[in-house]
Regions:
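Glycan-recognition patch characteristic of GH18 chitinases/ENGases
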Residues: 21-121, 202-203, 331, 346
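Glycan-binding loop/region signatures in secreted carbohydrate-active enzymes
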Residues: 233-307, 333-350
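Substrate-binding surface in catalytic domains of secreted glycosidases
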Residues: 26, 30, 62-70, 137-267
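Short, well-ordered coil/turn segments that N-cap beta-strands
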Residues: 23, 49, 85-89, 127-129, ...
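Conserved, mostly hydrophobic/aromatic
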Residues: 51, 91, 133, 186, ...
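Short acidic catalytic loops
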Residues: 52-55, 122-139, 189, 315-320
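Gram-negative bacterial Sec-dependent N-terminal signal peptides
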Residues: 1-19
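Generic structural signal for well-ordered alpha-helices
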Residues: 72-79, 116-123, 147-154, 210-215, ...
Length: 351
């Protein structure tokens, strides 16, 4: 580990005891982790309290199926290891391009009941602690159906956890605080803010924009102690721009301009990048001769955890577990944990 990274990591500071409400650390485990050679055995279970498995896909008749059947064995192993490590496994149902199907299900009382019953049975059969309803691109037109679906799930789940994924920056008008308050907690997700369509470089994700999303739901009447903000463990690279406000000329390095956090840490071991923390947005930017990379690193994730703790939010979610660095000194999960769960031993395990 070089001195540059160590100095960058000093932003961790000293951890203090978290408020009682800010006790959840959620890690997302998507089915595509298998293609990144990241298996359930690679999860550092002591770093999280909950794991959200992404995802289970619904059909319009209320039945359920794995989004990728190649991941069934991985899911079984995930369920086994989560139970052994006393981590709650939450199954995400819905997700990308599933809003049409969820709307069809919600429109029929009979199908809603079938769907909710199937979800409850799936949880029982697979040892899962609960479900996350992930209805993306929700519109005001579907708000009534969304509420009916939430109520059907709540009735069917009994004592199991109901979580809801919310996207307030794109669907604020569709949410009702009284509906979201039916959930044990609400994961607050923010879409990418910097894309190829933007004419000027800006943060892709930041504490500032996450706080905007949290405030939007609070204004809707959602209980603060139920709100759980999520952040992405990847950065986005753009050619040409040498800082915020400059015009990029195209996508930079990485897989279509996307670099996982652990890939970024490898890049920053060289002197090619100047990494700095932007106080206004509470996000990071790395600038080289060829490109700029916008991301959330240790200082911004620490600031997010501090916000959660000081405001009494439910916790923090990381999307996704495969992208973090495993060295404790640069791990973002450790950064969260030192703020919210300081009693945990975050030292690297001896091999």
């Amino acid at each position: 580990m070089n001195l540059k990274l160590i100095a960058f990591s000093l932003a961790l500071g000293l951890a203090t005891v978290a408020n009682a409400a800010a006790d959840k650390v959620v890690g997302y485990f998507p089915y595509w982790s298998q293609y990144a050679q990241f298996a359930p055995k690679d999860i550092r279970f002591n770093m999280v309290t909950h794991i959200h498995y992404v995802s289970i896909a619904p059909s319009s008749d209320g039945s359920l199926a794995f989004a990728d059947e190649n991941d069934i064995e991985n899911f079984k192993e995930l369920s086994k290891l989560a139970a052994e490590n006393n981590v709650k496994l939450i199954v995400s149902v819905g997700g990308i391009e599933q809003e049409g199907t969820l709307a069809e299900i919600a429109a029929s009382e009979e199908v809603r009941g079938t769907f909710a019953s199937n979800v409850a049975s799936f949880l029982d059969e697979n040892g899962a602690a609960g479900v996350e309803l992930d209805w993306q691109n929700l519109t005001a037109e579907n708000a009534e159906g969304f509420a009916a679906l939430v109520n059907a799930l709540k009735d069917a789940l009994g004592g199991k956890t109901l979580s809801i994924a919310a996207y307030p920056l794109t669907s604020a008008d569709a949410y009702d605080g009284s509906v979201l308050n039916n959930a044990e907690y609400v994961t607050v997700l923010v879409p990418d803010q910097m894309t190829e369509e933007n004419s000027e470089l800006k943060p892709n994700q930041s504490v500032a924009v996450i706080e905007e999303a949290l405030n939007a739901l609070s204004a809707k009447g959602v209980d603060k102690e139920k709100l759980l903000p999520a952040f992405s463990l990847y950065g986005k690279s753009f050619m040409g721009a040498k800082g915020f406000g400059e015009a990029p000329t195209g996508v930079g390095s990485g897989n279509e301009g996307i670099l996982t956090y652990k890939e970024l840490m490898k890049k920053f071991e060289t002197p090619d990048y100047k990494v700095s923390f932007d106080e206004a947005s509470k996000s990071e930017i790395a600038v080289s001769e060829m490109e700029s990379i916008v991301f959330m690193g240790i200082p911004s994730v620490k600031a997010l955890a501090e916000l959660v703790k000081s405001e009494g939010y439910a916790g923090v979610a990381a999307y996704d577990l495969s992208q973090d660095h495993t060295e404790p000194i640069v791990s973002l999960l450790v950064t969260i944990g030192l703020e919210l769960r300081p009693d945990v031993d975050y030292k690297a395990k001896k091999k």
